[in-house]
């Protein structure tokens, strides 16, 4: 009962260890409702859930929250979206949706396409979001602003601002938002954080 990290190479049995750790917890009386398991791929999540069900039974495993970081965070956000001003049925933009929106924004801002290529701009925005850098945080970070000026893209902050606003107005999030918005949710709303802390006693 405490933090633990397992470091091992591919095919060495990490998934098996996690699977049997979860099954052991459940056999010791821990309710599957109180267990959260995060994986990097949907395939791994499916395989783990099937293995656990084969050990403890399908009925026992049904309340287990298991999935990729993105799928689990999307599930949390759909339950709590109203706190952030989003509908519970918000749209999740894929890369093509995001590139299309950025192309429109870049055109509306009359920016040179050679300097602001939509896919590259999206990559930069993705870097911001995965570093938990919001639009406000960007404009408060002189190093980021200077870096974009040096890279000949001084309007990056404005594009980011418009992109976030347009997504919000459309009731949409992109894949990176699933991480950024969940962080925002749990940071801004302590009662929501407490709710999930109380529920998930074991996170693997």
Predicted segments, located by residue:
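Conserved helicase NTPase motor core
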Residues: 2-10, 16-17, 36-37, 44-45, ...
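ATP-hydrolysis module of ASCE/P-loop NTPase motor domains
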Residues: 60-63, 82-177
């Amino acid at each position: 009962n405490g933090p633990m990290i397992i470091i091992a190479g591919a095919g060495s049995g990490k998934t098996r260890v996690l699977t049997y750790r979860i099954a052991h917890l459940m056999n010791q009386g821990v309710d599957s409702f109180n267990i959260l398991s995060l994986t990097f791929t949907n395939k791994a999540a499916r395989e783990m859930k099937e293995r656990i069900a084969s050990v403890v039974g399908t009925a026992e495993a049904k309340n287990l929250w298991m999935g990729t970081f993105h799928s689990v965070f999307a599930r949390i956000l759909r339950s709590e979206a109203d706190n952030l001003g989003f509908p519970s049925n918000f749209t999740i933009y894929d890369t093509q949706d995001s590139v299309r929106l950025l192309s429109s924004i870049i055109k509306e801002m009359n920016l040179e396409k050679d300097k602001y290529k939509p896919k590259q701009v999206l990559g930069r925005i993705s870097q911001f979001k995965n570093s938990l850098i919001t639009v406000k945080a960007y404009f408060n970070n002189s190093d980021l602003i200077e870096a974009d000026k040096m890279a000949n893209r001084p309007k990056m902050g404005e594009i980011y601002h418009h992109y976030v606003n347009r997504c919000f107005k459309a009731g949409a999030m992109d894949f990176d938002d699933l991480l950024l918005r969940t962080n925002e949710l749990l940071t801004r709303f302590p009662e929501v954080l407490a709710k999930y802390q109380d529920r998930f006693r074991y996170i693997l």
